[in-house]
Each structure stands twice: as structure tokens, then as C-alpha cells.
């Protein structure tokens, strides 16, 4: 039995809607999907207590070290398009991608993938309110507005 590990990122200021999508899809038992359904874990981007929007306390399964085991990594909507992405997170995402992990962003999580350089010379999408800003900041990305998602196989982006 091989249950691939899906890891969703959590961080202070996390948007619960996008995070909830990952939890609903991969975090619930799915016996109808067979024995090889995914394992699910939550990785804290930074140590210590994390609070999502609205002050909701988050419990994580570990830190960025979990990304080394993940077959799929989900980056929910980032805490703000103007908030810098930690270098350690970028490094872990690059390493995971290089070893073959799928990397997926939801909504403004695309800015994390862009900061890591994972979208250079690729098509990508995000929420319509961020498409112009994404294109301005990262001209090497082929921003495709007005689509719900772009699936490049190893990197996926969604509108959110």
C-alpha cells in the first residue's frame, strides 16, 4: 500500500477558505477511493503558534521538513501579495520540485510559487484581482487570466 503524502502549508494570517479546500479534499477519510488514498499533513511555515484570519488557532503536524516527504504540496492563498515569502520556504519548494513533487497554489498562493521561481516561462493563473500585479512583478510568467486553473503536470495554479 502506497499512500502518497499531501502537505498543505499553514502560516500566520492563513486564509481559511483556500486552506479548507485542501483539508476537505485530502484530509478526510475517503474509503470509497480505495486503500491508496492520500495521507495528509499540515506544515507550519514558521515555528510557534499560528493564527488564521479571524484569530483561529492552527495546529500543525510539523514544519517545512515535511515538504521533503511530500508527493504534493499545496500553497493556499498567501497572506498578502505584498508580504515577502521566506527564503527557507522558497528553498524547500524548489528542492521538493526538483525531486519530483507536484506543487499546487490556490489564489494568491501563486505569489509563493513565483517568488521561488517555479513559474518562470510557464503559464499560470490566479484570482482575477491579482493577474495584473502578478504579470507586472514576474514578467517571466505567462499569466493567463479568465481560467479556473492551469495544470502543467508538476506545477498547478488556480484562480481561487
Question: Which residues make up each language-model segment?
Answer:
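Short, surface-exposed amphipathic charged segments that create phosphate/polyanion-binding patches used
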Residues: 56-58, 139, 158-159
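Conserved anion/nucleotide-ligand pocket segment
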Residues: 148-160
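Structural detector of well-ordered beta-strand residues that form the stable sheet scaffold
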Residues: 103-104, 125, 144, 156
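Extended, subdomain-level signal for the structured scaffold at the beginning of enzyme domains
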Residues: 1-103, 111-115, 145
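Residues that mark the start of a beta-strand
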Residues: 3-5, 123, 154
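A conserved active-site-flanking secondary-structure segment within enzyme catalytic domains
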Residues: 119-148
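Short, amphipathic alpha-helical segments
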Residues: 83, 87-90, 125-128, 132, ...
